[in-house]
Amino acid sequence: MILEHVLVLSAYLFSIGIYGLITSRNMVRALMCLELILNSVNLNFVTFSDFFDSRQLKGDIFSIFIIAIAAAEAAIGLAIVSSIYRNRKSIRINQSNLLNK
């Protein structure tokens, strides 16, 4: 696969994730867009590791660490969203003011 094609795909994924994160009013959708951003970064790490340093697996190992951290972030984020929904009955970002009761 050509390096430029993979980088363009990663840039598209990153752009879609940023756009969704900026325009999203739903907390779950914002978490999904954040995961999309992290996966585009992982795609870059794996691609550069494969093309430029195929003997050492630094990019692949770093990508595995990012996947593990993203899984923990998603679990914690969904737990927070679930707690907010139980208390506020809404998961819209603009309706949840956590300082007011």
UniProtKB/Swiss-Prot annotation:
One of its GO terms (cellular component) is NADH dehydrogenase complex. It is found in: Plastid, Chloroplast thylakoid membrane. InterPro entries: NADH_UbQ_OxRdtase_chain4L/K, NUOK/Mnh_C1-like. Its EC number is 7.1.1.-. It is a multi-pass membrane protein. Its main location: plastid. PANTHER family: NADH-UBIQUINONE OXIDOREDUCTASE CHAIN 4L, NADH-UBIQUINONE OXIDOREDUCTASE SUBUNIT ND4L. Belongs to the complex I subunit 4L family. NDH shuttles electrons from NAD(P)H:plastoquinone, via FMN and iron-sulfur (Fe-S) centers, to quinones in the photosynthetic chain and possibly in a chloroplast respiratory chain. The immediate electron acceptor for the enzyme in this species is believed to be plastoquinone. Couples the redox reaction to proton translocation, and thus conserves the redox energy in a proton gradient. This is NAD(P)H-quinone oxidoreductase subunit 4L, chloroplastic. It comes from Oenothera argillicola.
